[in-house]
């Protein structure tokens, strides 16, 4: 089975006839609900891989109910299998004068037109619950026709039980992102035999090792610069306040060493997160650092300053950075951290969610939370347990890697080998197909 330069268009989709869904003579209709595959966020990346794989199966007819297809944010370099039949939720709603972002008001019509054998929802519990509410009548009428599957994105342990139970009553099967989340679903009352694990895989076609010195030169860095990377988007859950405090504490300890630099790939001001400029300025004031020097000599970002970058740019950035940092309060999977680590770059990360599964065997620094809060309704409607780490612990991990290049190399090698062996799309997609066969 040969690999394809277009990712999973051919390399991981062909030669799997023994794992195809159902009987080879029957076309199985699948409606896949997810973020549009051209979007730069994790939902888009994973949706792209899954849909290309399914569309390449000889007995699958794939419909893609694509949400969040925002113009001006697409990665035009991504391969999209031409067999996929798209329903663009934003375009469909715009045509009827609706401001709905998730296609909830058109999902019943689409389901009745397609009558899929399997309906896969790849989203969080709020969007999933809204869709299921809109489909209660359909499910009652066509319960023997369509199997409902929730590929559920949980980010905090013990999210709102009312939503979990509602989804449990109205789907035939769950896919969890990792062992951590499968256990949490079971702890919340979902039957163990109703939950499978569908990991995110590492895309070895899109992300490949480039010599560090070449990547650093591309961004104008010196070979001996110590580049710290945070690619998380700017939302409260990603806790960029902790990242900024940890980075500035490292600068303070190292007397503003000119080699220490932070590259961030997200919006610098976000209503759902922080104004990064304000964070830096106030923390510099606390620590006695010169804000202008920090901003102009130690903090870097892409010129657009909004966090939208093509996969090729991200690949170059992963290779330029020496370590990654992720200070989140909860994590569904941690795709950016996993991808960066898979290129041999150790991470300093919160020990939360799926990150505890990915990095449990070493090769990086897992920072243990110091406090737990229940998420308030006004912060996030799905609630759950929010885990907070001490920024000093992240500063300790970053400082250790700054002073120990051999440790960086050893840890980078170890975590890369672990990820390549564990999060291999070949294996993951075959297991996914086996689980889908059980559902029919």
Task: For each feature predicted by the language model, list its residue ranges.
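Aromatic "clamp/platform" in nucleotide-sugar-dependent glycosyltransferases that forms part
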Residues: 329
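Carbohydrate-associated surface elements
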Residues: 180, 201
